[in-house]
Amino acid sequence: MYKLLGGLKEYLKWQDIVTDNAIFRLHNLFTTVLLLTCSLIITATQYVGNPIHCIVNGLPVRPINTYCWITSTFTMPDAFLRQVGSEVAHPGVANDFGDEDAKKYYTYYQWVCFVLFFQAMLCYTPKWIWDSIEGGLLRTLIMGLNRGLCQDDEKCMKKKALIEYLLRHIKRHNMYALKYWFCETLCLVNIIGQLYLMNHFFDGEFFSYGLRVVAFSEQSQEERVDPMVYVFPRVTKCTFHKYGASGSIQKHDSLCVLPLNIVNEKTYIFLWFWYIILAALLSVLVVYRAVILAVPSVRPILLHARNRMVPKEVTNAICRKTDVGDWWILYMLGRNMDPMIYGEVIADLAKKIETPSSNNP
């Protein structure tokens, strides 16, 4: 297991050429690794240990454990408000008195590791799509100018090739930028969709899960119900039917301990907060991209902020002659190139872009 977890760090390696945004990487890399780690830990706990222990009189324990694991267990919701030790044996565990409608069934626990793995794949999908679309364009354009260690002749040759490319392909990068911003929007759609998925998976209990956990400590001892125990009960009931010696159907109640829910409750309270934070960050990012797209006047400001060595007059001149896609290419070049070389490229580009014939070398 340690080897498997150690292999996940490869996804978090620093990229020498950055083609995306930090929030984009939080979604695609960190969240993917987080979900895969949780899935591996829960899988190891579930299939290496014993995820359920049922107590029943007069029947072999192993078949009962298997039956209750693959079917479902239940609690009585009204029993969570009763006093443990005097009114009920455990939170949520009480006599059902034959009232099937009052039972709350738990069927999720055997699927948690698979759902987490599926969520990890969903989080990685936008990165896979973007890597396929990007195709190494920025790496090709930079040509090692991110390190600034090349000889003067080599540097001049690479700068000239880069400027010629930018002039030749001016106003042809809009789809490049729009496809990347689409992938960022896809991240937001994915996170919101996964919140709904988890809420459905936990029978409508996930949306308010984190808020109830926070409010739990502020409630009075007599009135509060631990939301983690309610959603992830440690002790539940299971009913097993079998034929007796005379052929009559016998009903056997068993008390089932679910040690795996100790891991599940901690996993999902962290995921609740992380997904809310990530959804907020992605929402701000999508609005920010919309402003860049709709308000051209902010582009030279951002381009100047990327490299303070480039005068505002130069960024204004460039942004007047280019589209949003060209601006995005220049902005990303500024994130990756040596600042001195980048300043020289922008200055030379601004001079040539003002010449009408420069667009058709």
UniProtKB/Swiss-Prot annotation:
Compartment annotation: Cell membrane; Cell junction, Gap junction
Membrane topology designation: Multi-pass membrane protein
Chief location: membrane
Residue ranges annotated as Cytoplasmic topological domain: 1-28, 131-181, 289-361
Function: Structural components of the gap junctions.
Leader sequence residues: none
MF term (GO), any: gap junction channel activity
PANTHER family recorded: INNEXIN, INNEXIN INX1
Coiled-coil residue spans: none
One GO cellular component, as annotated: plasma membrane
Family: Belongs to the pannexin family.
Disulphide connectivity of cysteines: none
Protein name: Innexin inx1
Tissue note: Expressed in embryonic neural precursors including the dorsal median neuroblast, glial cells, neuropilar glial ring, developing myoblasts cells and in a circumferential band of epithelial cells at the trochanter/coxa boundary stripe in the developing limb.
Protein keywords: Cell junction, Cell membrane, Gap junction, Ion channel, Ion transport, Membrane, Transmembrane, Transmembrane helix, Transport
Transmembrane segments: 29-49, 110-130, 182-202, 268-288
PROSITE patterns reported in the protein's UniProt record: PANNEXIN
Gene Ontology biological-process annotations: monoatomic ion transmembrane transport
Taxonomy, superkingdom: Eukaryota
Keyword set includes Transmembrane: yes
Species in which this protein is naturally found: Schistocerca americana
Pfam families: Innexin
